[in-house]
Curated annotation (Swiss-Prot):
Protein name in UniProt: Thiamine thiazole synthase
PANTHER family according to UniProt: THIAMINE THIAZOLE SYNTHASE
Modified residues (2,3-didehydroalanine (Cys)): 206
Catalytic reaction annotation: [ADP-thiazole synthase]-L-cysteine + glycine + NAD(+) = [ADP-thiazole synthase]-dehydroalanine + ADP-5-ethyl-4-methylthiazole-2-carboxylate + nicotinamide + 3 H2O + 2 H(+)
InterPro entries reported in the protein's UniProt record: FAD/NAD-bd_sf, Sti35, Thi4_fam
Presence of keyword Transmembrane: no
The species this protein was found in: Yarrowia lipolytica (strain CLIB 122 / E 150) (Yeast)
């Protein structure tokens, strides 16, 4: 049985307090006219109802997205920006986002050195305007008062799209590959597992993964780290690319332009964006400025749209 359609609750009025709303609900539930918190009562529920509500929907999503149109690895600022553009441009596409962390957002919850404000160089403010994030205009750059405002807004916008599913606390352990008639490698999906399982392959055995097929993947896993630069490191180990360039030292002026310009399909079926690119090309790191992450995601989405029909046809062969 399909879950019921989502219901959006609207406040009683701009002056309504939490107690007013509780009172209205309690009148419906208990027929009580008491206007106090002491009369408050939740609707009844059984524990198994909660379990079934969660598990049924999750396994329906696993079934639905086992064949996806696009898989995005990494739900940082670049991956979420790509998901937003794709979902808005092509509501017919099934888009699965796979994020190793419990909390999506990557490093975009704070600015540099755990400070609050987020800096973006122009013209990245156009993306802020698109998703409805207010900012202070400082001439050549803009400042969002707290990085979490950008990340939470972008995340909520993405998750509202009916054609997007976020699988967080889920790691990509490998890439699904195919070869064409000429023997050239093409990426055709991802191999997944619970992140906590992925972290314990050294001390536990026989923990096989799951898979998601898709004609094209966007990898935005960040610079080198435990889960970072995953896809491009895997390409090296399977001899699909010769070696990584290695991220260079910090140069904001060079780094942001390079990341956006070089966002591309590295091998057929795999588009790479964000700081993962710096490991491929030997680009500079950019430090605590976030415009390139957002716009690299936008370009990654546009790149997918350009090649999607071709990759989908190949995926059916």
């Amino acid at each position: 049985m399909a879950p019921p359609p989502a219901v959006v609750a609207h406040p009683l009025s701009s002056q309504a307090t939490g107690l007013d709303m509780v009172h209205e609900f309690n009148q419906k539930l208990t027929k009580s006219d008491e206007h106090t918190w002491e009369s408050f009562k939740f609707a009844p529920i059984r524990e198994s109802t909660v379990s079934r509500a969660m598990t049924r929907r999750y396994f329906e999503d696993l079934d639905k997205y086992a064949e996806s149109d696009v898989v995005i690895i990494g739900a940082g600022s670049c991956g979420l920006s790509a998901a937003y553009v794709l979902a808005k441009s092509r509501p017919d596409l099934k888009i699965a986002i796979v994020e190793a962390g419990v909390a999506p957002g990557g490093g975009a919850w704070l600015g540099g050195q755990l400070f609050s404000a987020m800096v973006m160089r122009k013209p990245a403010e156009q993306f802020l305007e698109e998703i409805g994030v207010p900012y202070e205009d400082e001439g050549d750059y803009v400042v969002v008062k707290h990085a979490a405002l950008f990340t939470s807004t972008l995340m909520s916008q993405v998750l509202k799209f009916p054609n997007v599913k976020l699988f967080n606390a889920t790691a990509v352990e490998d890439l699904i590959t195919r070869k064409d008639a000429q023997g050239n490698l093409r990426i055709a999906g991802v191999v997944t597992n619970w992140t906590l399982v992925s972290m314990h392959h050294d001390d536990q055995s026989c923990m096989d993964p799951n898979t998601i097929n898709a004609p094209i993947i966007i990898s935005t896993t960040g610079h080198d780290g435990p889960f970072g630069a995953f896809s491009v490191k895997r390409l090296v180990s399977m001899n699909a690319i010769e070696k990584l360039g290695g991220m260079r030292g910090l140069d904001m002026g060079l780094a942001e332009d390079a990341i956006v310009k070089r966002t591309r399909e590295i091998v057929p079926g795999l588009v790479v964006g964000g700081m993962e690119l710096s490991e491929v090309d030997g680009a500079n790191r950019m430090g605590p400025t976030f415009g390139a992450m957002a716009l690299s995601g936008v370009k990654a989405a546009e790149t997918v749209l350009e090649v999607f029909d071709t990759r989908k046809k190949q995926n059916q062969e």
